[in-house]
Amino acid sequence: MLEFAHEKFNRLDCICNNAAASRGIGPLESYSLEDVQATLDLTFTALWKCLQAEIKYLKNHPNPASIVNISSNSALKGYAFNSIYAASKAAVNNLTQSAAKELARKNIRVNAVSPGTINTPGVKKYFEDEPSAKEALEKSSLLRRIGEADEVGELVAFLLSERSSYITGQIISVDGGSSIN
């Protein structure tokens, strides 16, 4: 995909990395090594591999560039019964800040967006299966609602744009205040 974009447009200025999956939800002691490895592979390692490939295209790029990684607010304060996913997203946050430090001198900004509960098809399905969860998650937000995907997308678009040219190494929450509640 990177080769196609680079060949078609002869440049690559902005990239959003969004990789996530959780292999099971349950108590920490219930996870198998395979569950842990699969979650890390799909959530952290996949993003890391993308970042490595992107850097090859961007490091000698004459124009400023921006990378946004999608994290999760579970990385900021842990997540009971989904701890491996939370840990994998915490690794994404650390990778984001490490990459920002390494790549700033090449005029490449790297940030992460950390969504809370967002009204996606997967979340809707979860609420169908667990109706009480929706109310509990709405109450955990200072704004008393679930976020919408376009609210995350607007922040990503801003961070990828030149309007955010002085922002790098940041983990920015889009969670209705639930991370501070």
Language-model regions: role of each:
Residues 13, 29-49, 68, 85, ...:
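Catalytic Tyr-X3-Lys loop
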Residues 22-25, 77, 157, 168-181:
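Short C-terminal tail/terminal secondary-structure segment
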Residues 22-37, 56, 60, 81-84, ...:
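Conserved mid-core segment of classical short-chain dehydrogenase/reductases
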Residues 51, 88, 96:
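Active-site helix of classical SDR
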Residues 105, 117-140:
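A glycine/serine/threonine-rich, flexible loop-to-helix segment
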